[in-house]
């Protein structure tokens, strides 16, 4: 799909939004060549399982990601870790005396995965604050990230925090994911729109592991993903999310907010899966 950072079920909603605005979406294609044709135009050649194709465009945007730039740090004696990023401790020290580092060039403490590399602006700002305070003699510690992200695609907003099910491999958990569709506010009040919410949790303990949300821009997607992010930071269970005292007025929400409706859906799915496991064990026994 267009937004591969989401599960396909939610990513397909983003793909549909792009197509709704008249754009052709070619996934599973490899760009094999880009060449100027004159007159400010560019010819782009692609290859996929369905064959080769070409198109002419006025503008070509190439997005190939980022990588850490570490030459200066390596020359100073710093060590490199995941993805070639600079190894730092929780105080953002590099191990080289009087040298701190922060941002996209350093490894990141992920509150679920441990040490990883997660180049995000929000993370960089927090790390920079920690590094600056400690340079001045402080004792600040970076509390860690849960990878919260949000993006606007035309009239749609997509967000995620924590882990998707396939990303939980390094953890000793029994991951379960449930997708729920819930309205952003009470349906009897005009303008209600659906949110598609995916919740991932540990089927054994109920611990929240991650969430994804896709919905219209008016539906406070960023606020709702931040609710899940806060719960992840505090190591809450999915049941704890259901118990949160969240704000409510009919134009803006429901007595059970959409995030809580999704959490309830996950709880029912987990209970059913656990009961099925018990029944299976009884049959085998």
Give residue ranges: language-model regions.
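A Rossmann-like FAD-binding core segment of flavoenzymes
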Residues: 1-90
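General small-molecule cofactor/ligand-binding pocket signal
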Residues: 24-26, 100, 176-178
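A short, glycine/Asx- and small/polar-enriched loop/turn
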Residues: 36-42, 95-96, 190-195
